Regions:
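Membrane-embedded alpha-helical bundles of multi-pass enzymes
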Residues: 3-8, 13-237, 433-434, 445-448, ...
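Short, conserved active-site loops that position catalytic residues or coordinate cofactors/metal ions
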Residues: 52-67, 91, 253-254, 284-297, ...
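Active-site catalytic loop in hydrolytic enzyme cores
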Residues: 99-106, 133, 162-191, 311-314, ...
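CN hydrolase (nitrilase-like) catalytic-core segments centered on the catalytic cysteine
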Residues: 102, 106, 119, 137-139, ...
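Flexible, glycine- and charge-enriched loops at secondary-structure boundaries
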Residues: 115, 263-270, 435-438
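General beta-strand structural signal in soluble alpha/beta enzymes
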Residues: 162, 167, 322, 348-349, ...
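Soluble catalytic regions of membrane-associated enzymes that act on cell-envelope
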Residues: 236-357, 361, 390-394, 400, ...
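Conserved beta-strand and immediately adjacent loop positions that scaffold enzyme active sites
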Residues: 248, 335, 387, 455, ...
Length: 531
């Protein structure tokens, strides 16, 4: 036999190599041209961005994510990094465009660029997984079972890392947060945010594997795999959350111009919230909830502000949860106070997750010289709080999340572990105008309500303010950029969902599946190559 014929025979044989997991698909390892892959990644990143609020076309997550994953098939390391950066920029550049409203393009480009680098690193791992898995698990069971799980685990691993690092991470943009209005959202009570992201990525990887099948008849049959997984996900009932009474809440949106660069006179923001509350005087409620920064005068240091809060609490015959900035020696805190007429501040919470490069500048000595004009916009550094994120409101335990706190998985778990019956989430969204930022944050709050099995009172200076039930439904909602109040009987619960019981081990497990699967695939692929 000639060398040419022998080589062709060996190639043909390698395409049909049998595996303990089934017969290999011929031509399954074909890859796209680089420019096509880049275009798919950009289209995928843009599609994923549209799945999130404001548009909220959540089914697009099953279009955008598969396109990104498909663009990585067969890519070399540097190609996967380049494709990943393009896909990341398409997603992040669209998803967080709201940063530009008051801060301009530089912070937007910096954050989108940083997140795109992390996105690209995750894509590089996924590209390696495609390459090794095609060799290690060439049979049908490997292609449709093992490989998609590995790919989904690596996607979730990247989300886990960027949600926690650096400087506490940036948890925005996780796949699960796109599903706040979808039937898949209920799953977070069982598997948590990371678990739902894993499931969505798993379905997406299955879609890619079916699309890669070279024989049309096989594609039709094997399409039952992602369809079956989706059907299984939708068949899981909502977690049985049992309510245990209600609390009557008055949540106030003052429509205050409380932005970073707003030209307001001292006390104006406080008066805006007093004016919005005055029509409720005499109404029977258990607690009044004002937003983050609702008192621009620190009532712990300012007698005028303290007197106003005493008067409002007296008129409402109820305690007030009010956001303000407090100081203690050289430390400055973004705080919530529980204020009662006659007693003053009976409890205090200091924000546990202040926003890096917004509420404080980490490693100021390093970063400030790099862009002094930009970082001069952060004249003071908020200190990370040390108090627990709970208030006891006449026997009702309220978990507390100031603005960005709501994206932190650990802080939500701390509330529930501390016995929270309800979650109060005061926030100040004035810096983001009429953009999608506030509805994206509300979507996260909605997912937290379902995940924790708790009602969430999301109260903003300008909106979007809403009260969310433990099942994620909307109890009440206010128009943005208008003063208003929500007075509702809000359900309480002591049910502990599976997501809260399992906690971090869920995300560590699914992330570990990706990492361990990648290592195993690499070892098996190398062994097959040497054999």
């Amino acid at each position: 036999m000639s060398r040419t014929l022998r080589t062709r025979s060996e190639k043909a044989e390698s395409r049909w190599t049998l595996s303990p997991l089934g017969a290999a698909a011929p031509g399954h390892g074909k890859r796209l041209r680089l420019w096509v892959a880049a275009a798919l990644a950009v289209a995928g990143g843009g599609s994923d961005a549209l799945a999130f609020p404001g548009l909220g076309w959540w089914p697009l997550i099953f279009v955008g994510t598969p396109l990104i994953l498909l663009s990585l098939v067969g890519r070399r390391l540097w190609e996967s990094l380049a494709v990943g950066v393009l896909g990341g920029l398409a997603f992040w550049g669209t998803h967080i465009l709201w940063i530009t409203v008051y801060l301009g393009p530089v912070p937007w480009l910096a954050l989108a660029g940083l997140e795109s680098i992390f996105f690209a690193l995750g894509c590089a791992l996924i590209a390696l997984a495609w390459r090794f898995s095609d060799r290690a698990f060439p049979g049908i069971w490997g292609r449709l079972c093992l490989t998609p799980i590995v790919i989904a685990g690596l996607w979730t691993l990247r989300e886990y890392v960027t949600s926690n690092w650096p400087y506490g991470g940036f948890s925005w943009g996780r796949l699960a947060f796109s599903q706040s209005e979808s039937p898949f959202g209920a799953l977070v009570a069982w598997v948590g945010i990371s678990g739902l992201s894993f499931l969505l990525a798993w379905v997406s990887a299955l879609i890619v594997q079916v699309a890669r099948e070279p024989i049309a008849r096989q594609r039709v049959i094997q399409a039952m795999a992602p369809v079956g997984l989706i059907a299984l996900m939708l068949s899981i009932p909502a977690f049985p959350v049992v309510t245990s009474g209600t609390i009557r809440v008055a949540a106030v949106q003052g429509n205050a111009d409380a932005g970073l660069f707003a030209a307001y006179t001292p006390g104006q923001i406080l008066q805006d919230h007093v004016a919005a509350t005055e029509p409720l005087y005499g109404t029977s409620v258990d607690v009044v909830v004002w937003p983050e920064n609702a008192s621009d005068l620190d009532p712990l240091k300012n007698d005028q502000s303290a007197g106003i809060l005493n008067r409002v609490s007296q008129q409402m015959n109820a305690p007030i949860v009010v956001g303000t900035i407090t100081t203690d020696a050289d430390s400055t805190f973004n705080s919530l106070l529980l204020w009662k007429d006659g007693d003053g501040p009976v409890d205090q919470y200091d924000k546990l997750h202040p926003v890096p490069f917004a509420e404080y500048l980490p490693d100021r000595g390093f970063w400030s010289p790099l862009a002094p004009d930009l970082f001069s916009l952060i004249p003071r550094d908020f200190t990370i709080g040390t108090r627990d994120n709970l208030f006891d409101i006449n026997g009702v335990i309220a978990g507390l999340a100031i603005c960005f706190d709501i994206v932190d998985d650990d802080l939500v778990r701390q509330m529930i572990a501390g016995g929270a019956d309800i979650i109060l989430a005061p926030t100040n969204n004035a810096d983001f105008g009429h953009t999608d930022q506030s509805v994206q944050q509300l979507a996260i709050a909605r997912m937290r309500a379902i995940e924790a099995g708790r009602s969430v009172v999301n109260t903003s200076t300008v909106g979007t303010s809403a009260i969310i039930a433990p099942d994620g439904s909307t109890i009440d909602r206010l128009q943005t950029f208008q003063p208003g109040v929500m007075v509702q009987q809000v359900p309480l619960s002591q049910t502990v969902t599976l997501a809260m019981v399992a906690g971090r081990p869920i995300e560590l497990t699914v992330s570990g599946l990706g990492l361990i699967g990648l290592v195993l695939a690499a070892l098996l692929a190398r062994r097959r190559h040497q054999g």
